[in-house]
Structure formats: C-alpha cells, structure tokens
C-alpha cells in the first residue's frame, strides 16, 4: 500500500514535469495535417491513441510512437509535437497510450500496444496507410517498449512467449526504429544513478531491489530485457541519447550490439539544451532539430527507399 502511494506521488510530480515539457515543445498543428484524437482501442480509459496525417489520398508509411514516463506515468499528448514532424513529412503518425505500472505488469503493456496497432491496421485502407512500411519510435520507457515491438515482429515466437494475441502477427514487420534515451537491460540498469530507477522497475516487475539482487536465474532478467531480442534480423535503427543523461551508456551499449550484429544504424548524441534525459524529442532546440533531420534522412534510406544519403552527423 505504501509503495502504491509513493508511486502516485511520483506520478503526480512526473505529470507536472510533463506538462512543463509540453508547454516548451508547443507548436500549432501544421497546415495540411489532420488530427484524430482519443481513438479508442479498448474500453479502459487509458486505451486511446491519436493519429496525425495528411489527408491527401497518398499511401503513407506508418510511424508508431510510444511515450515514456518510467513505466508509471506519461501521456501521448506530450509527444504530439514530435509526431507532427513525421506527419508533415508524409507519415501517418500514431501516438499510443497504455496502462501504467504497478497496475499493469510486464508484458501487459506490450499486449496493449499491439492491440492498439491492430485496431489501426484494421483501418489502414481508410487512412491510406502502407502497412509494409512501419517505423516504431519512443523515448525512455517508450524506447524500451519500441524495442520489444520491433524485435517481436522479427522473432515471431515471442508473440506466444508474451501471450500477445495479434491478428497481423504473420505479416507485421517493423522497417526501422527510432530509440531515444532508452533502457534495454534490467539487471545492469538497476545500478545506474538515475532518479527512482529501482522504484520504476519494482513497479514493472513486482519485485523490490533487494529481491532482485537475490535472483540468480538469468531467465528472470531476460524476460525484462529487450536487448535479448536484438540480433541480425533487427530493423535498421536510429539511436539517440542525451549527452548528460545517466542512461546514455544504455544507448551506447545498444549501438555496439547493432554494430556487432551488422544491423544498419545511426547513433546521434544530443547536446546543448537537448542533453538531458528525453529532451531530444524537443525539436525546437538545436540538437533536437538536428537529430530529427538526421533521423529523417536515415528513414528515407531504409523505409522510403530514397536515394542513399550520408549517415554521418
């Protein structure tokens, strides 16, 4: 009971920070971009997503965004302006909410995210979505879930492993990832000097830090570590980290894994105003904007089959 109260206080404070971030990132809806807000993919109050796209009759690749918030907080509205950037560039940008821990434990959120994706794919023709071109993206906890979505789409046995009932399991395949300030290894991350990280993982796993320290079965940690799904089949990826983020080692380790597996990737360190955790999604600041431009060029090459461009930044 005390832990749930603590998480509620933490969530309240996180939501205040999120709203400040939303104000800092605010921009008007771009001309020609249509907003469909609060689309329900389930009966629960959190089971909603938004769709941002240009209603021009052209086929559009799908850009799926999953927000962060330490597994216990956050809201898709904070990331709306980041999604606008992709809608402007011809994507159908989907922005998903999911249920928070500790009420939902891993892999509940994965099941919910795939349920939202299924709901939209059922309507792909209505919005002229090209389901053969899919980008999945997220920041912080959203990058954690995005890695799972991408990895599961390539290693389909994990649908059954995680109990995911997904109508499009045989055909859905992620073309590229955009992973911002993510976390990918449970066992290592528990010891990082990142505020409240042990509480976040307690909420997600149902285990205290002391309990997890006494677990010697690596299969427990594997279940909560999306890096285990990363092999040569993983899609081309953009890895963005903030230079003053105590989690940046996770992005560096992830990039090394992609390099080892010979997966095409772009690794972009964001500095300046964007140098703090999750700040690179603010495209109004210098390195946030430059990171976006580099990301778009990378996606043009691997998703939109554009002319090869220089990946170095």
Predicted feature locations:
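Alpha/beta-hydrolase superfamily serine-hydrolase fold, recognizing
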Residues: 1-313
């Amino acid at each position: 009971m005390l832990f749930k109260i603590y998480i509620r206080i933490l969530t309240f404070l996180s939501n205040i920070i999120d709203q400040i971030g939303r104000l800092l990132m605010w921009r008007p809806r771009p001309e020609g971009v249509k907003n469909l807000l609060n689309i329900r993919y389930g009966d629960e109050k959190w089971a909603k997503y938004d769709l941002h796209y240009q209603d021009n009759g052209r086929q559009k690749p799908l850009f799926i965004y999953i927000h962060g918030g330490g597994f216990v907080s956050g809201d898709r509205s904070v990331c709306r302006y980041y999604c606008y950037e992709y809608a402007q560039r011809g994507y159908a940008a989907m922005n998903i909410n999911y249920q928070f821990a500790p009420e939902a434990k891993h892999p509940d959120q994965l099941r919910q995210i795939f349920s939202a994706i299924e709901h939209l794919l059922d309507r792909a023709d209505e919005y002229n979505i090209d389901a053969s071109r899919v980008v999945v993206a997220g920041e912080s906890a959203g990058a954690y879930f995005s890695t799972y979505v991408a990895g599961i789409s390539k290693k389909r046995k994990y649908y059954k492993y995680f109990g995911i009932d997904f109508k499009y399991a045989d055909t859905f395949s992620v073309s590229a990832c955009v992973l911002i300030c993510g976390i990918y290894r449970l066992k290592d991350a528990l010891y990082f000097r990142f505020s409240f990280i042990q509480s976040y993982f307690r909420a997600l796993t149902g285990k205290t830090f002391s309990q997890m320290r006494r677990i010697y079965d690596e299969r427990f940690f594997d279940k909560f570590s999306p890096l285990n799904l990363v092999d040569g089949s993983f899609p081309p990826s953009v890895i963005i980290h903030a230079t003053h983020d105590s989690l940046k080692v996770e992005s560096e380790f992830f990039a090394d894994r992609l390099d080892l597996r010979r997966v095409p990737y772009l690794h972009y360190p964001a500095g300046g105003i964007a140098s703090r955790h999750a700040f690179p999604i603010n495209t109004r600041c210098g390195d946030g904007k430059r990171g976006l431009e580099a990301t778009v060029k990378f996606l043009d090459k691997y998703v939109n089959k554009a002319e090869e461009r220089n990946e170095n930044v």
